């Protein structure tokens, strides 16, 4: 089965559940994993992954981190005062990777 690839959010700042949902979906589709396969890889129920990719509330932080880790999505913590600097640096690194 071919999985339609989606792209990561253009802004690395996770401002909502929907932004994180888009990143998880992008990681899964770029790995050519179906939702069922990704749920197996992440060791979570399929419905949990469905809820995450839909941006639904109610998924525990532990499960969300488990899914993100299994799919290779990294989350970073930075003080709000450094948000724009960190955002800019991550975008620069991401853009440099696009040129390779």
Predicted regions and their residues:
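N-terminal flexible/basic segments that precede or flank functional cores
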Residues: 1-19, 82-100
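Short alpha-helical DNA-recognition segment
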Residues: 33-50
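Residue-level signal for the short linker/turn that defines the boundary of a DNA-recognition helix
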Residues: 22, 32-33, 59
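Conserved beta-strand edge residues that scaffold enzyme active sites
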Residues: 42, 81-82
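DNA major-groove recognition helix of helix-turn-helix/homeodomain DNA-binding modules
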Residues: 62-78
């Amino acid at each position: 089965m071919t999985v339609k690839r989606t792209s990561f959010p253009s802004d690395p700042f996770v401002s909502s559940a929907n932004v994180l949902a888009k990143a998880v979906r992008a990681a899964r589709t770029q790995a050519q994993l179906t939702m069922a396969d990704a749920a197996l890889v992440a060791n979570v129920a399929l419905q949990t992954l469905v809820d995450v990719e839909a941006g639904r509330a109610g998924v525990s932080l532990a499960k969300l981190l488990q899914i993100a880790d299994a799919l290779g999505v990294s989350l970073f913590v930075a003080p709000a005062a450094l948000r724009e600097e960190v955002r800019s640096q991550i975008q620069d690194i991401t853009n440099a990777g696009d040129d390779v």
